[in-house]
Amino acid sequence: MKQKHFLISLAVLATGISVGAQTKDNVKTTFQTSREWKPSIDNRADAVMVYGVGGNPSDKSRKLSFEDRVKSWKERGYIIHFMTGIAWGEYQDYFTGQWDGKWHLDEGQVTQAGDTIWHGHMVPYIVPSENFLSYLKERHVKRVIDAGVDAIFMEEPEFWARAGYSESFKKEWKKYYGFDWRPQHESPENTYLSSKLKYYLYYRALNEVFTFAKEYGKSKGMDVKCYVPTHSLVNYSQWQIVSPEASLASLPCVDGYIAQVWTGTSREPNFFDGRKRERVFETAYLEYGSMESMTAPTGRKMFFLTDPIEDWPRDWADYKKNYQATFTAQLLYPNIADYEVMPWPERIYEGLYRTSANSDKKERIPRFYSTQMQVMINALNRMPLTDNKLTGSEGFSVLMANSLMFQRFPTHNGYEDPQLANFYGQALPLLKRGVPVKTVHIENLGYKEALADTKVLLMTYANMKPLESEAHSHIADWVKKGGVLIYSGTDNDPFQNVREWWNTNGHNYTTPSAHLFEQMGLPARPEQGEYSYGKGTVCIVRTDPKDYVLHEGGDKDFLYLAARMYEQNAKAGKLYSIGKDSSVMLH
């Protein structure tokens, strides 16, 4: 009976939501596969992303040529797109010298121990050199466009935080900084510099490849669209991976993203009320939210991904439960209505997985699950775009920055941020009590829409740093007009003192927050308390947000403060979710 009710609810969602603006093109649903068409993997989406000129390196089946795979799907009425990896892929001809007569396995990402980080056999994660980018453009992008494909998806621009020791990375360091490479484990400064370079290398890679794709397509009379399928900033930060993320939205050659959120990313444990555990629904909600807020002010297209299984082998009951959790989370963003309905249907429909957690017996997908899954996918095919809002006390936003990824590994001076607790410490206390907390990207504050729906902004510099000073002007202006800022932080993590704009070129601030506070007429290091600025309010709490979730009951004072600021200062209404009198004094 529960399953029946779940399916009926989906049908109501698909047909009953008021329709707002429509999507800009006719691709609403898509999926990725390295296989040719066959009935068992035909899921009736609008488009298919045919994976890899040489296929998917993890797929060991006999592969048809790229052109034959394209033809097989096109004959069945599918719109054809292309997907491949930008950091890894079926590129053995490059690594083994078939491209230019030179071996390039030394261009893999390497750890301090001297080990290459592999995605698979002969498939290293790449330090994207100019030579590799030339190879991608000539051997892959040209061939795809020549086959008539006018949409290219370059997925997962990923540089592992624990990497940064290869000769190829050292060469890129010298070119970028003008001085010799420095080991990232030796100081926070070196870690920060290393992360900024990793960030830049994949920004450059996507910019070059996509710009080439558009220019080459134009020479063929084609308007080529370019997209970045990427994990969320939440997940990359937690998994200790550096990626360009929000900065890509500023590139004119990037037309949109796929939010790669699924059970595998969302089951990463986090802390709440002193307990570390999986919280798949809550994490998925925040992951999708960070992707939505990353592109919302820019107007770029966004596909939301869900996966009925995951990369790690588990059992069908586990897959189904967590698929439903992530699927539900994506529907809580009604302003997004384009979807990648699944990756790799060949492994979903044809793979063998355990029948239960306590059994070694393996079977293909149960009929009841495949039927439910197809109903869910068909609902997405008809899901309208809407400007509907969630119920609940809206107006809380957590500030994020790409530099969240810069402070994750290695750690220094004994400062730890376990499981990204400084982020979750601001979000989970509210979310777990039914408050639909959102995220805002500091890189987007220049867009007036970025803070338009925010009543109370939650921020810290314990886990990130502002890469540009302009963000502080935008925050100060927003507060002056009536916004409420709650700043939580001791400002004593080891990255406060890295050489950056706040302590160079005429600036002499000991912390980035000192510059922010100065914009609002406060001293460089104000005491904990409540301050007025213009029509708005600044609350400073001298506690790192991780302490709100690492300890049982650690969020009590934070919740009372958030409720009081929301109700009394922001005048945003009653925060019913907290459920207690929210009068509390800051001392």
Where are these regions (language model features)?
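Catalytic domains of carbohydrate-active enzymes, especially glycoside hydrolases
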Residues: N26-D68, S72, K142-I152, P252-Y257, ...
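Hydrophobic targeting/anchoring helices
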Residues: I41-D46, Y51-G52, E155, G217, ...
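Active-site-adjacent "subsite" loops/lids of carbohydrate-active enzymes
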Residues: F82-A147, W181-Y199, N207
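A glycine-rich, often tryptophan-bearing local segment used as a flexible ligand/cofactor-contacting loop or short
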Residues: W99-D100, P466-P545, L550
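Aromatic-lined carbohydrate-recognition surfaces of secreted/lumenal glycan-active proteins
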Residues: D25-T33, H81-G85, F153-P157, Y192-I241, ...
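Bacterial Sec-dependent N-terminal signal peptides
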Residues: M1-T23
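Glycine-rich, aromatic-flanked loop segments that form ligand/cofactor-binding clefts
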Residues: S65-H119, D150-A161, A213, G217-V228
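The substrate-binding groove and active-site-proximal loops of carbohydrate-active enzymes
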Residues: M49-S61, I117-Y135, S187-A205, T230-S232, ...
